[in-house]
Amino acid sequence: DSIDPLTGDDGKIRAVPFAVEGYGILYNEEIFDKYCAMEGAKVSSPEEIKDFATLKKVSEDMQANKKELGIDGAFASTSLASGEAWRWQTHLANIPIHYELQDLGADDSDNLQFTYNKEYKNLFDLYLNNSTVEKTLAPSKSVSDSMAEFAQGKAAMVQNGNWAWGQISEVSGNV
């Protein structure tokens, strides 16, 4: 698919996307295959995860079975070291803001109420509570730490974007 240029009301092209980023939850297919083959797995395929409730069930079950899966946690560590919280302050925060703006029928607002704060907190807590490290250690973790955990197969999932492959592929021992 192509991305259409941005046009004004007069139909004239005003901008052309130069780069498009996508982000979400990346998952390790090998770990998920192992999980889905386990007796009692909450899903038989990662494609079945289409809502928060299912993601929560799977994440918590993976965390409970981390030894059997050979991982340290369902999610790679949440990087909260100084200057490293951009995944949570911008990327993750964009989601509730998007839905609030959609509810307002607007592209921008000077007065956001953060009406989807509960959903934001639920996802953030899911990351913290089902992590490779105790949540008290999150303030000492960097994005590099988190991506190394994911790259080395110590975590089944990590929140990041399409730019992450460069970082994953450079980690010694990546799987």
Language-model segment annotations:
Residues 2, 28-31, 51-58, 84, ...:
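Stable alpha-helical elements in mature extracytoplasmic
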Residues 163-174:
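C-terminal lobe and pocket-closing loops
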Residues 49-54, 137-152:
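Short helix-initiation/N-cap motifs at beta->coil->alpha
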Residues 143, 160-165:
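Beta->alpha turn/N-cap motifs
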Residues 7-19, 23, 53-109, 155:
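Extracytoplasmic/periplasmic solute-binding protein
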Residues 37-49:
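Short, polar/flexible loop-turn hinges at active-site or ligand-entry regions and domain interfaces
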Residues 56-63, 99, 103-141, 169:
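Glycine-centered hinge/linker elements that transmit conformational signals in sensory
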Residues 1, 5, 12, 30, ...:
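Extracytoplasmic "Venus flytrap"/periplasmic binding protein-like
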